[in-house]
UniProtKB/Swiss-Prot annotation:
HAMAP family: Ribosomal_uL22_B. It comes from Agrostis stolonifera (Creeping bentgrass). PANTHER family: CHLOROPLAST 50S RIBOSOMAL PROTEIN L22-RELATED (PTHR13501), LARGE RIBOSOMAL SUBUNIT PROTEIN UL22M (PTHR13501:SF10). One of its GO terms (molecular function) is structural constituent of ribosome. The lineage of its organism: Eukaryota, Viridiplantae, Streptophyta, Embryophyta, Tracheophyta. This is Large ribosomal subunit protein uL22c.
Length: 149
């Protein structure tokens, strides 16, 4: 005979992302210039989405110089391609738009899934074992901040 336990229903409490964003935000949105943005995307990076997301959560809503310091000190493998992407976005901002690197601010850092590369590894007795290598697309948006008076 099986016995069933009566479990009281406990509603789940959802974490509000807006609260987390407000806590992490360093610059008020009224000081961000609306159309002064630089987009940079890197496609098909050989890395899991979850591993890249862990690093991107740390650099979102930070200044460029602070981001570079954080990424240099992070022990994760995902930090190096993201660091190259941030460097490239800042170089594009200074070269094409004449922005100052001290005023650049990361407003958007997102990662999305890409294709999965499938390979087969030979195993015992003539069998094969599938290997799935996931890839991701990373997008960084740098915004310029007005100087406070």
């Amino acid at each position: 005979m099986t016995s069933f336990k009566l479990v009281k229903y406990i509603p789940r409490i959802k974490k509000k992302k807006s609260v987390l964003r407000k806590l992490a935000r360093k610059v008020p949105t009224d000081r961000l210039l609306k159309f002064e943005r630089v987009f940079k995307a890197q496609k098909r990076i050989h890395m899991s989405v979850f591993k890249a997301q862990r690093v991107l959560d740390e650099i979102r809503w930070r200044y460029y110089e602070e981001t570079v310091m954080i990424l240099n000190l992070m022990p994760y493998r995902a930090s190096y391609p993201i660091l190259k992407l941030v460097y490239s976005a800042a170089a594009n901002a200074t070269h094409y738009r004449d922005f100052d690197k001290a005023n650049l601010f990361i407003t958007k850092a997102e990662v999305s899934r890409s294709t999965i590369m499938k390979k087969f590894r030979p195993r015992a007795r003539g069998r094969s074992f599938p290997i799935k290598k996931s890839m991701c697309h990373i997008t960084i948006v740098l915004n310029i901040v007005k100087k406070s008076k």
